[in-house]
């Protein structure tokens, strides 16, 4: 009944992943992002993560595996997904949804911390505002984007971009794979100093 559609979906996902892997710069950027986060942790910093919709779920997933665990038993790492419902509803109501992440960064971000912002289009105004707030706090910024990077292109210290122009879910599939690789590399890097 749907066997052809299922196979087509899987093959398209495979194609997007193969194209991402074929660009050696993507591999280097993933390593750079993992080292940037690890260096922040080693200096007493933390990661704040944010995104909208599925990217919000990815931001929460990333923070959860830092504070909890990925594959190895180890100390928790300091990470916060900007996902507190009372904060989001307060700022949305009082200032507007464009400021839900930047207000949080302004409140708790410190020099040497890392903002991990996700936007498949690269145009999410609230993530862009968070990047600006992070820069003002002398934080490092890692952006995970898609398509042509949108307005976020060139704003981050490290931008990992999935140049897929059709559906956001394909971009998110690569984002979650990259998040899992980042977790693995961060655990490797942090274990060096134990």
UniProtKB/Swiss-Prot annotation:
Residues annotated as binding Zn(2+): 61, 65, 172, 180
**Regions annotated as coiled coil:** none
GO terms classed as biological process: carbohydrate metabolic process; D-glycero-D-manno-heptose 7-phosphate biosynthetic process
Which Pfam family, any one of them, does this sequence belong to? SIS_2
Reaction catalysed by this enzyme = 2 D-sedoheptulose 7-phosphate = D-glycero-alpha-D-manno-heptose 7-phosphate + D-glycero-beta-D-manno-heptose 7-phosphate
Question: What is the protein's known function?
Answer: Catalyzes the isomerization of sedoheptulose 7-phosphate in D-glycero-D-manno-heptose 7-phosphate.
What is this protein's name?
A: Phosphoheptose isomerase
Q: Which organism is it from?
A: Actinobacillus succinogenes (strain ATCC 55618 / DSM 22257 / CCUG 43843 / 130Z)
């Amino acid at each position: 009944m749907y066997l052809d559609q299922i196979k087509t979906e899987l093959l398209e996902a495979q194609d997007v992943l193969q194209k991402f892997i074929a660009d050696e710069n993507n591999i280097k950027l993933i390593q750079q992002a993992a080292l940037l986060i690890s260096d922040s942790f080693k200096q007493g910093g933390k990661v704040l993560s944010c995104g909208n919709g599925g990217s919000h779920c990815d931001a929460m997933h990333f923070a959860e595996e830092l504070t909890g665990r990925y594959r190895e038993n180890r100390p928790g790492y300091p990470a916060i997904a900007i996902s507190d419902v009372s904060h989001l509803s307060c700022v949305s109501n009082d200032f507007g949804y464009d400021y839900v992440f930047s207000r949080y960064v302004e409140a708790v971000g410190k020099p040497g911390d890392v903002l991990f912002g996700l936007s498949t289009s690269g145009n999410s105004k609230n993530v862009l505002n968070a990047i600006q707030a992070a820069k003002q706090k002398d934080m490092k910024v890692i952006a995970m984007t898609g398509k042509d990077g949108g307005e976020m292109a060139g704003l981050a210290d490290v931008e990992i971009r999935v140049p897929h122009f059709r559906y956001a879910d394909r971009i998110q599939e690569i984002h979650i794979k990259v998040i899992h690789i980042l977790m693995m590399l961060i655990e490797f890097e942090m274990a060096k100093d134990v």
